[in-house]
Design a protein with these regions (language model features):
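Non-Sec secretion/translocation targeting segments of pathogen effectors
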Residues: 1-5, 134
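Pan-zinc metallopeptidase signature
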Residues: 5-9, 14, 154-193
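Auxiliary, metal-adjacent structural segments of Zn-dependent hydrolase domains
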Residues: 10-87, 107
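Short, surface-exposed acidic
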Residues: 40-52, 147-154, 178-188
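Active-site recognition of the HExxH zinc-binding catalytic motif
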Residues: 91-107, 131, 135, 139
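Extended compositionally biased segments used for macromolecular assembly or nucleic-acid engagement
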Residues: 111-114
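Post-HExxH zinc-binding segment in Zn-dependent metallohydrolases
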Residues: 117-166, 174
Length: 193
């Protein structure tokens, strides 16, 4: 399916392309956020900036209930809801830029891995857990603090009360067991550690 068909199927309509200067500004800020938030991963801020500045970014009309930003792996692009204030784009870009960093394709452009998600088998494995790991990393990077929430009659603390709160809590428990470095290294670099 073509990119245009994929967008149409999802109800995403591109309304504008972000200027090079805006993309560069977002890329610079996200690179700084990731490098300073995860020093143990030894991100090179300048290399990360150069990589992230290559991402095509768009404003789009998106259906109600969709995320405010969406990463489309087929064309390695980010689509921001046109209703997001410009000053908030970087906040939403962090999550999608992590998806960009974790994308692994074969020489024909077929997606093989996306962080903890393995697409090399007949069935997709780890998609939900990868999304939660990316949201956990995003919350850490943005300096989110624990908040108490109640879902399904369960009260618990989570670093991400509005986005995947229960699964982010599970990711935090996994990070406690494996060590946060190992979990996030696998998430950022699509490793099987």
């Amino acid at each position: 399916m073509s990119v245009e068909s994929e967008l149409k199927k999802e109800g995403i309509v591109v309304t504008s392309i972000l200027s090079s200067s805006k993309v560069n500004s977002i890329a610079r800020k996200v690179a700084n956020i990731l490098a300073t938030s995860f020093p143990e991963h030894k991100f090179n801020t300048e290399e990360l900036y150069i990589l992230l500045s290559q991402i095509p970014m768009y404003r789009a009309s998106v259906p109600k209930g969709f995320s405010e930003a969406n990463y489309l792996y087929k064309n390695c692009s980010i689509y921001f809801n046109e209703n997001i204030p410009t000053k908030e784009l970087t906040t939403y870009a962090v999550h999608e830029c992590i998806h960009y960093l974790q994308t692994r394709k074969d020489k024909w452009g077929n997606l093989l891995k996306l962080g903890l998600c393995d697409l090399t088998r007949f069935n997709v494995h780890g998609l939900g857990i990868n999304e939660a790991a990316v949201q956990y990393a995003t919350s850490v990077a943005l300096g989110s603090t624990l908040d108490t929430v109640k879902y399904y009659g369960i009260t618990f603390d989570t670093i991400s009360p509005n986005c995947y709160p229960l699964v982010c809590n599970l990711i935090a428990q996994m990070a406690y067991i494996t060590g946060e470095y190992v979990l996030l290294d696998s998430t950022f670099n699509s490793k099987d550690d």
